[in-house]
Amino acid sequence: MSPFFMMSLLFGLTFGQTASVCAPSEYTIHVEKRECAYCLAINTTICAGFCMTRDSNGKKLLLKSALSQNVCTYKEMFYQTALIPGCPHHTIPYYSYPVAISCKCGKCNTDYSDCVHEKVRTNYCTKPQKLCNM
């Protein structure tokens, strides 16, 4: 092997993960319930960014567990609860959402993350909007 190839390989293995940019990012969630009069716009932080992954050419030869990709996910988080205004008494007017404190590149945990990217997802209000700053 040539010295250039070896140096490139060592550099890539050593500093490859530093190219990942995964950090808490400000995000607005729009929440509404059919029974409630208002839509609530909640400012929070989510984990967003890019994580280095490696795609194998021999997918048929590997176990499914070896094919999982790293995603930008929560390292530390807590749940905040907001009150949706204008709800009738028989409705539960609370909505809980995650707030990212720190993030990491790792396997997606379906216990607290949506691991599937949906192509069509709306994030807007259809009712009069109230702002919630927590």
Swiss-Prot record:
Assembly and oligomerization: Heterodimer of a common alpha chain and a unique beta chain which confers biological specificity to thyrotropin, lutropin, follitropin and gonadotropin.
SMART domains with a match to the protein in the record: GHB
Stated role: Indispensable for the control of thyroid structure and metabolism.
Keyword Calcium: no
Organism: Gallus gallus
GO MF term set: hormone activity
Transmembrane segments: none
Family according to the record: Belongs to the glycoprotein hormones subunit beta family.
Record bears the keyword Hydrolase: no
Cysteine pairs bridged by disulfides in the record: 22-72, 36-87, 39-125, 47-103, 51-105, 108-115
GO biological process: G protein-coupled receptor signaling pathway
Name of the protein in question: Thyrotropin subunit beta
Glycosylation-annotated residues: 43
Signal sequence bounds: 1-16
InterPro entries xref list: Cystine-knot_cytokine, Glyco_hormone_CN, Gonadotropin_bsu, Gonadotropin_bsu_CS
Keywords: Disulfide bond, Glycoprotein, Hormone, Secreted, Signal
